[in-house]
């Protein structure tokens, strides 16, 4: 299987040596479950796309510092690409954080900066609905998060299958072809911590401190990798 990674941002230059690019993170995360997966990378901020959707078996949209409600031209192009994939429904599509939000917005949902403020650290989501590909079974799971924007209203064909009081729409599906996560299963805890430290001045101290403490636990990245691989291969 070949996964097309649609890169929507760059890792800060001083962190690349330790953590790699966002595509590197995605590849390492998924290859712990499927070493034979192949990957192609597309810098969609620079309007670089596959010449044809058939180039890859599935696509994944990464996280980004951008907001989905900005009006940059590359966002409009990517939104149309999302709709094209969804309408064809022959390719699986995965969204992470920004990718999760942009897919929701592109398909008719609503995203904006939440009045609840920052979500940072390890966030636990409760499973509302268990899908067949969610093996091993789990009632809840934890993933790194760092976001202010979040999904406020789902598209009519979408279903929230996991969430929490702070972020009710943490995981969303659209039939059998689209799966999106607000959390970052591809992020190491140390990368989340590095991003938090860079943004400490714009967070409330209590939120920042609680987020750091939460990183004492371990994320369920491998569990979610199993789920995503099952979803892609079903």
Residue spans for each PLM region:
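N-terminal beta1-alpha1 cap of cysteine-dependent amidohydrolase-like domains
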Residues: 1-73, 77-87, 209-234
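Amide-donor transfer/coupling interface in amidating biosynthetic enzymes
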Residues: 2-8, 12-15, 25, 87, ...
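Conserved beta-strand termini and adjacent loop/short-helix elements that scaffold enzyme active sites
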Residues: 42-44, 114, 146, 163
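A short acidic, often aromatic-flanked loop/helix-cap motif at beta-alpha or helix-coil junctions
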Residues: 46-50, 119-120, 152, 168-169
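Cysteine-nucleophile active-site neighborhood
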Residues: 62-131
């Amino acid at each position: 299987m070949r996964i097309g990674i649609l890169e929507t941002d760059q890792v800060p230059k001083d962190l690349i040596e330790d953590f790699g690019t966002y595509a590197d993170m995605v590849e390492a995360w998924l290859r712990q479950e499927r070493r034979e997966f192949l990957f192609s990378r597309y810098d969609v901020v620079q309007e670089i796309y596959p010449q044809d959707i058939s180039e890859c078996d599935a696509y994944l949209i990464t996280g980004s510092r951008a907001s989905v409600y900005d009006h940059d031209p590359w966002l409009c192009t990517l939104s149309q690409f999302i709709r094209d994939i969804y309408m064809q429904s022959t390719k699986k599509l995965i969204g992470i954080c920004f990718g999760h939000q942009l897919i929701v917005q592109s398909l008719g949902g609503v995203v904006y900066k939440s009045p609840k403020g920052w979500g940072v650290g390890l966030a636990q989501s409760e499973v509302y609905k268990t899908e067949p590909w969610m093996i091993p079974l789990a009632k809840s799971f934890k993933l790194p998060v760092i976001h202010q924007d979040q999904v406020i209203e789902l598209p009519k064909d979408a279903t929230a299958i996991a969430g929490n009081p702070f972020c009710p729409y943490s995981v969303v599906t659209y039939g059998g072809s689209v799966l999106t996560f607000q959390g970052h299963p591809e992020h190491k805890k140390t990368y989340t911590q590095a991003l938090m430290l860079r943004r400490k001045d714009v967070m409330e101290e209590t939120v920042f401190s609680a987020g750091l403490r939460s990183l004492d636990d371990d994320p369920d990245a491998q569990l979610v990798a199993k789920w995503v691989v099952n979803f892609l291969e079903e």
